[in-house]
């Protein structure tokens, strides 16, 4: 696959505390050859599932909630650095925060500081996904010009119940890349989407 429109772009990925965050390395490795540089910003709950140190092997830099050497990260600098900001996986919590302008962590504050729209890749179980409040938050994000790529139906192991069952999951890295490219092209065609 050759997506030359992205080759000189800087991609920022926000990682939230969904269990699917443990598979983020496959997305980072896949995206690596299509972007100039990839950086990651993580919530504390994401770091509880996969340490920032581990994620750093698959990208150019990781920003974590606690900062570096006692110094907090600037969400403004992080947001301005990125040409494209995606949140993979996006939890119901981050959808709710950002839809309502609430910024309780570095991932959410960076959405507010990023000069363009953000692309959200939600991942949660069916019970959460089908809640009216989640639908309302997604609708608000879209009204605000953000892009929400819906999860797909898959057979998945549900940790909460310890069973395999039909559920929701992230789209594959190759399809995620196509969604990012499409979102970027739309933004360049319609600057009002920023």
Swiss-Prot record:
Q: Name one GO molecular function term.
A: phosphopantothenoylcysteine decarboxylase activity
Q: Name one GO cellular component term.
A: phosphopantothenoylcysteine decarboxylase complex
Note on cofactor: Binds 1 FAD per subunit.
Which of UniProt's keywords are assigned here?
Answer: FAD, Flavoprotein, Lyase
Q: Record keywords: Amino-acid biosynthesis included?
A: no
Is Flavoprotein included in the keywords of this UniProt record?
Answer: yes
Enzyme Commission number: 4.1.1.-
**What's the family?**
Belongs to the HFCD (homooligomeric flavin containing Cys decarboxylase) superfamily.
Name the job this protein performs.
Answer: Catalyzes the oxidative decarboxylation of the C-terminal cysteine residue of mersacidin to an aminoenethiol residue.
Name-wise, this protein is Mersacidin decarboxylase
Q: What is the lineage of its organism?
A: Bacteria, Bacillati, Bacillota, Bacilli, Bacillales
